[in-house]
Amino acid sequence: AARATVNNAFYTSPEIAMCINSALVQFGFRGGNVLEPSMGIGNFFGSMPAPMQRSKLYGVEIDSISGRIAKQLYQNANISITGFENTTYPDNFFDVVVGNVPFGDYKVFDPKYNKYNFRIHDYFLAKALDQVRPGGMVAVITTKGTLDKANPTIRKYLAERAELVGAVRLPNTAFKDNAGTEVTADILFLQKRERKIDIEPDWVHLGVTENGIAVNSYFAEHPEMMLGSMEYDTRIYGQDSRYTVCVNNDENFNMYETLNKAIGNIKAQMTDFERVADEAEQTEEVIPACLLYTSPSPRDRTRSR
């Protein structure tokens, strides 16, 4: 499927990619099978700290120019120049999925997921969760719509399959220097559950900020995880706008320092275990994977139903 926007992963700054990768190391990740499903030229691969560099890298990029550049830059990685919907990776294969998923108000044709009617960014999250193993981590940038939209369907879907270990809301200027655009986006850290469960934690639903703006309950309860304040965007949509953006007008604001501080609030522990290679991998080196353990999170409090 064609994208409405061009190569979001290309425009992810190396600094943001490094912050996300460093979070995985902070959690204890020390290498395994890593997928970037919308990789652009591979800024996440190029920003891996030393402990992650022993990983086996897999990438997907629909744009042929960016994909060919990535193949040249990361010649030991398994990179496919195609849409994520065309890939056939087995479920439960990857230890970590990282990246910046494409944002857009359009859908991808994939027979396995068509019944959910997901927008492209939510589709990427759903498929990534299937392909990461139980206990694995999906650490991706997505539009704020995933957490803030009024319809909770995607959040209910994700919550049944993963714990939201943590999230950080970026200000709308986070991609301005690299992409020339202002967009409010979130970094999500999702740990896949051992099995699907019927659960409805607070973050499936919306709350309000101190100034009465609708926002995901996670951010209403943890405003320190927003790198700015939520406002109505009246510049584009007029005085009656209900479209919200995350804004930080502090002239001394250092996004990367603040982002690292926010990520430091997220607690998770990862311990090594040895993956049993299947027949297709018997001739290859077996790379130790990492299994994520977290203590029961207060963010998974269930609502009475």
Regions found by a protein language model. Give the residues of each.
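Conserved Class I SAM-dependent methyltransferase catalytic core
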Residues: F118-A174, F189
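Class I S-adenosyl-L-methionine
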Residues: A1-L73
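Conserved SAM-binding strand-loop segment of SAM-dependent methyltransferases
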Residues: N76-G83
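A short acidic, Gly/Pro-enriched loop at the edge of an enzyme's catalytic core
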Residues: Y89-V97
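Conserved small/polar residues in nucleotide/adenosyl-binding loops
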Residues: Y293-T302
